[in-house]
Amino acid sequence: MSTGFFGDIQKIKYEGPDSTNPLAFRYYQPDEIVLGKRMEDHLRFAVAYWHTFTWPGGDPFGGQTFLRPWFEDTMKAAKLKADVAFEFFSLLGAPYYCFHDADVRPEGKNFAENTKNLNEIVDYFAEKQAATGTKLLWGTANLFSNRRYMSGAATNPDPDVFAFAAATVKTCIDATQKLGGENYVLWGGREGYETLLNTDLKRELDQLGRFLNLVVEYKHKIGFKGTILIEPKPQEPTKHQYDYDVATVYGFLKKHGLENEVKVNIEQGHAILAGHSFEHELALANALGIFGSIDMNRNDYQSGWDTDQFPNNVPEMALAYYHVLAGGGFKTGGTNFDSKLRRQSLDPADLLIGHIGGMDCCARGLKAAAKMIEDKALSQPLADRYAGWESVEAQKLFRGEYSLDEIANWVESKDVNPQPKSGKQELLENVVNRYV
């Protein structure tokens, strides 16, 4: 039954590239076969509950601009928000959604009341999922908004805050499992520091390691089959965040023996904040064996902060999905639109239009990436560039069968005098442009 929030808007349909209807897909066709699999199953789109339904439209210089009928901290309002959310998922045809606990339940006066409220809304969500067919991609706990977390959650100097955060994560993993969630995400927005003057780095990193081990231990204890994901971000809200980027997270996981237990949820905007391209973080995660999922939202390249805008750059999406596909595609992860409307976009239809544009952009990127893979447009030049390493002698060199002395003798006796070869960057950039 319609809530009336979206007026008379009907389910969004595919109308093709020539359509000028803003409430129609031009490129996203869920059932189109790409590399032998349905487009929907490749992309695994999810809607972010927080930015889509809880963000009030504020910024550092002004308050709320969105007037939503569910903007009250009551269970009645939470259920109305859920009604609108699941209507939205159905209109959009989004197969998945994601949430923080604080997005979906009213704030209680203590941990017990928070848990009671969460359990009640989870039961309501379960009914909604059964009625609509929408599934949970991942759940997570908000361990950064409440003032108790102003000095961190896992890394807080107060052990009571650590304990409260750990207990909250336990309830959120339970909720995720009950709803059939395929992943559980940890984002350490306050796990970092503002100044080293009051920060014991070693202690805080050790606390974070203990916290993550607790999560993994609990996952196995209850038989949760989903993937535990860490979402890297270099800063904001803290000056320096401990899960800075993919490389930093991998080093942390390796130190704590968790590199085979935890993977990464990579956000495009966070990669940019860390001084990387999105495809760099994706390629590195593949190389390290920790790729899990993505948050698909871009930043304004001039503002210098996390603006969480919908993707609209097809060449960027093509390279991103190239690395996703080259790594074998999503297993339990997917494409979560951690994107929010601009604060002047007040109409309910704007929520749909933003997601439609993002989904079309991703669909175009996916198809371009798939064609590049089919044609070996990038993989063949890459294989040719490193072909020298396939020789018998080079393989022995790589496997460590020669000592440094033996290598030096070999170079001298063979009069090895290598000459550089072109990297063909311009050619490869032109090749990519042919596909997008």
From Swiss-Prot:
Entry-linked InterPro entries: Xyl_isomerase-like_sf, Xyl_isomerase-like_TIM-brl, Xylose_isom_bac, Xylose_isomerase
UniProt: Mg(2+) 1 binding residues: 231, 267, 295, 338
Binding-site residues, Mg(2+) 2: 267, 270, 306, 308
Magnesium is among the record's keywords: yes
Cofactor note as given: Binds 2 magnesium ions per subunit.
Pfam families referenced in this protein's UniProt entry, alphabetically: AP_endonuc_2
Keywords: Carbohydrate metabolism, Cytoplasm, Isomerase, Magnesium, Metal-binding, Xylose metabolism
Chief localization: cytoplasm
Main enzyme class: isomerase
Residues of the active site: 100, 103
Gene Ontology, cellular component aspect: cytoplasm
An annotated GO BP: D-xylose metabolic process
EC number: 5.3.1.5
Catalytic activity field: alpha-D-xylose = alpha-D-xylulofuranose
Needed cofactors: Mg(2+)
Gene3D superfamilies: Divalent-metal-dependent TIM barrel enzymes (3.20.20.150)
NCBIfam families for this protein: PRK05474.1, xylose_isom_A
Subunit description: Homotetramer.
Name of the protein in question: Xylose isomerase
The species this protein was found in: Rhizobium etli (strain ATCC 51251 / DSM 11541 / JCM 21823 / NBRC 15573 / CFN 42)
Taxonomic placement: Bacteria, Pseudomonadati, Pseudomonadota, Alphaproteobacteria, Hyphomicrobiales
